[in-house]
Each structure stands twice: as structure tokens, then as C-alpha cells.
Amino acid sequence: MAHRRKGINKFKEFLLSITHAEKESDKSNKLNLLKSCCDLQISRTGEGDEPVCFPDLIQTWSFADSNNNESLLTIVPSVLAIFLKTVSQQLEFREFGVALCKFLLQKDQLRLFNRGLTANKSKEHLISPCLRLLTEIVTFDGGAVAQQLYSRRYITFKRIDVFLTPNKSQLEDVSDDAQRSTLRRNAQRYVLANLRFQHGAAKTDIVEEHKVIKAFFEFLRKDPRDLVLDIIRSIDRDIIHDSLLPRSAKTKFFSRWNLERLVTLYGYDKESEEPNPAGVSIANEIHKVLMTICTDTAHGVLLPQNGWYPVGSDPESLPTMDEHCLDMGLDSPVYVDKYRESVPVRNGILSYLIQILRPDVDSLQIELLVAIFKAAPELVADFFSKKTMFVSDPKPTASWMTESAFLYSTIELPIPANCGWNDYEMPVMPPPASVVVENILPRPLTRKILTRCLNLNTDIITLFAVRILTIALNKLRNVRKLYRYEHGPCQSLWNQASQKLDGQIYPRCPEMKDVISLYKRTPKEDLQQQEAVAELLACYYQVVPGLAFEEKYDVTLTLVDIFKRLENPDLRPKDSESLMGQLRSILKVASTSGSMRWWQKPG
């Protein structure tokens, strides 16, 4: 057997020399020599029979199986895999290569594969060559025999989930060479090849194979960078953008568990010590994929939903009322708002996913979360009914500021058309106030938190509170316009809903005295903050007058001061623009406030 092993090793060296040939002429000569060899290594036993390829090599493999020669059991499938990889791009080898792949999938050769694939998991040297050979078979000639390979899945897919699970020692070995061949990596490459080249029912079966796909994703964050990138690109190309793959299969592929594993890749670049010469960010790549998956109903995760109307509500019908009953409107037990603590949603997968995202960690996760909210507005109230935020005191820390940015972006989201019910017309009934309020001023923004922000001597936090209150009140103003739209005989219900919404918004807003105090103590030279606070004052008077009129505030002297400053000939254009913005806001306050003393001479 020594001479056989020596001959196989020589063949292996020859194949590798073709791959590494520097001169094209040398490579061409060696390929011609290999082609002549292949022509002598193919034969048919009878008319209509499949060709027999490399009979001596296969006989050696069979002999190794019979005699338990692990050295030959390792080298033969390895050489066959190298051969297929070497000739895969050479058109003149197509016929021989396809014949060889078919021959290897015959019963006698499948028995040899079975020997390798049933070996103890610790014997990677027996299993991995078989996986590499199967990978080359499924990819050869664009998947010419991929379907035949899958039809033998009782052998060719045996224990793949087991091979995808790394040993404990491999998980603990943080110094593991990223380029080293491991059983898991070979199994992953095999799965990727099947996702690429299988089609129809075969691909659907693989995608829906829960144990395999779960094991495939399980330790993704510990996989080498190049493999992770290949996996991300395969998901994009072979799952997301495969229009022939059924939506139901995509839904199973993008299960809660698998999506959670993909989300962990946001932290890959921070934890990985592996060199990144290409400068490709794993976080950016997975972000693109998740943005696509989570915001398009075609990809199996996002489901159509009804925006601000929770699952189970029916805003198109009014219950019949007995003529002797007192009409209490939305205060009737029929309309009890039962969504303060939990909101039923259709998008269960996304509801789970958004809870594991970390908007306090990076801007990419904020972008994904806000994009999900925009695509499925039903999830906003669901998210805030479960998520605890702003547990620490307002401080200009990275986590606090990123959470602030997330809340700001959430409030900035547009009001769903017809409150999300459909694209054609407003429903009869208004949405529950407890759902709407979370889209305007989410519950992490309590009166206590916002008041502390306004009273802090930290400009960035104070300005955040001012800005976020302003956009929230402007959004409330727009919601009221929607509620005042002609709703026919149900207009009284919409008017009542507007009042109920105010009843939930008001307790979350800081008191007027705190806003006035902030405006008065803001330095005159800080024109940016003065303009922002003046705009907030105007919003209080115009949008939440019930809060504004709790305090008397005469802006006469403020107006006089602004006019004087505008008359300064040395005023810069930028400062003039800021003062004009402030003037517009203070004039709105003056036109609304009942505390103005227009005819009193300034002291």
C-alpha cells in the first residue's frame, strides 16, 4: 500500500502545482497532461451505463475502507476534492468532471462516504475530506449534479448538524487560527454550497431543516471573518433575493433564534482580534441584510399590520346601543382601553427581535430599530410596554446619549396613513390613546426625567429635552388635525379620543414653570438654546394650553429686548436669523398669553 499512497501523494502535488503555477504556459501544459490522464481514466462497462472514473483511485479508497486504513481513507477523498476544484473552471474537463461526480454518487461510493461521515466526531481527519469532496461535487459545473446529491441525502446530509457544532475545546481556544480547516468550517462551506446551487424543493427542504440551520448559526460570532462575510453574502443572495424560494421557507430560516444570532454580529468587529486587511465591517454588512429582512414583507419576517390599531380590535364597526342606554362614548365599558401594559401584535418575530437590539450601544442598531418601527408602527407601543430605558440619571454618557437619539428618531417617525388601518380611508373608530401616546411621547420620557433634563446645567442634555418636547408637541398637533378630520356621525368619538390623548400626554410633559425658568436663565449669547426654548414655549401655548396657562408669563420685556438686539448694526447674519426665529416664537406666545401688558411702559 505504500506505493499507492506515494502515487496518490504525487498526484496531489501535481494538482497543487497547477493551481500555484506562475506562468500561464506551465499551467496550460500541465492541464493538457492532466486531460490526457483523464481520458485514460474513464470507461463504460456497457452501453447506457454511467462512466467509471479513476477506477484505481476508487479501488484504493474501497480497499482502505475494508482494511480500516485511515491514512488512505483521508487522502483519497482529499485528492478527489482537489482534482474537482482544480478543473472546475476548465471547460475541457466539464464532461469528465460531471461523470466523476455522478460516479461518486453511486451506491458503492456512497458506502465510502458513509464510512467517513459516521466516524467518531473526534476523527475530523476522516470526516472533513468527505465534506470537502461533497462540497466540490455540489458546486461543480454550476450545480450540475446538485439535485442528484440531495436525492442521496440519507448519506450526503448525514449528521451535518453534529458537524456544525464545534467541540468544547475549539470554543475555548480563542487563539484558533482563522485559516485552519476545522470540521465546523468544512460543514459550513458545504451548507453554503447547497444554498447556492440547490433549487426548488431540495433547497426549500434544506432551508427549513431546523436543526441544521440552527447549528449553522449557533456560534457565528466566533467564526473567522472571511467565513462570516461569505455567510452574510449567501443569506443576501441565496435566501433574501431568491424569488423562487417560498416565503414560508424564508420565515423558518429567519426564525427568532437565527435572527438573534445574526444580531450578535453587530459586535463582531469590536471583539474580533483577527486582522482585517480589506477593511470590511461585519457590522455594516449584517446591518444591510437585517434592514432588508425586517422592512420588506417579501422576505418572510415582516407581516402586514394595522398600525395604531392592535390585533383583535375592530375599528370599522360600532356596537349596537339600546335606545334606553346612556351614550358614554369612549367611557363606555365596550371601549375600555386595555393596552396600557401589553399590546397584541401580528409581528411576533420582530416583537422579539426589537427587544434584543441595543439602541444604547451603536447608531446602526438605532437605525434598524427605527426602520422596523416605520415598517410596522404596531411595534412602537409594544416595544415601550416592555422595554426599560433611562434607568440612570441624565448624564452626557455614550449610552444615555444614544438612547436619547433613538427616542428622538422614534418620535420623528411620520404618522401612519389613516393611523395604519389601511391605505384607503380612515376607520370609524379612533385608535386607543394608550397606543398613540407611545408614538408621541414614549413612556421612558416621564415628567420627572424631562424636568431633570431641563434643570441640569449640561447644555447638550437640556437641549435634547427641549428639542424632543418640541417635536413631540408638534406631532401631537398633527394627530389632532387627523382627529378633527370629518368623521361623520362618529366625530364625537374622535373628539373624545383627542381629549383622552391629552390626558395621557399632559402628565408626561414638564410643568410650564420649568420651561419658563429655563428660558429666563439661558444666557443671551446662547442664541441656539434661546431660539429652541422659545419655540418650545410657543408649542406649550398652542398645543398644550392647559399646561401653559398654569403659569402667568408676560413676554413684553422679552419682545423689547429682541427688537433692540435686532437693531444692532454689528449683528452677524447667522445671529440675526436666530433672533428672528426667536421673535416668531415669542410673538406666538404673546398672541396667546392672557398675561401680556401691551401698554405698560418698560422700566
Residue ranges and their predicted role:
Residues 69, 123, 180, 224, ...:
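Short inter-helical turns and helix N-cap capping residues of alpha-solenoid HEAT/ARM repeat scaffolds
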Residues 356, 389-393, 406-409, 434-485, ...:
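Extended amphipathic alpha-helical scaffold segments
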Residues 150-157, 205-212, 233-239, 251-257, ...:
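Amphipathic alpha-helical scaffolding segments
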Residues 42-46, 84-93, 136-147, 193-204, ...:
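Flexible helix-coil junctions and inter-repeat linker/turn elements that act as hinges
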Residues 203, 330-348, 352-355, 367-373, ...:
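Acidic/polar, low-complexity linker and loop regions
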Residues 10-370:
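Long amphipathic alpha-helical scaffold regions
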Residues 450-472, 508-560:
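Extended amphipathic secondary-structure runs
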Residues 100, 109, 156-159, 211-213, ...:
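HEAT/HEAT-like alpha-solenoid repeats
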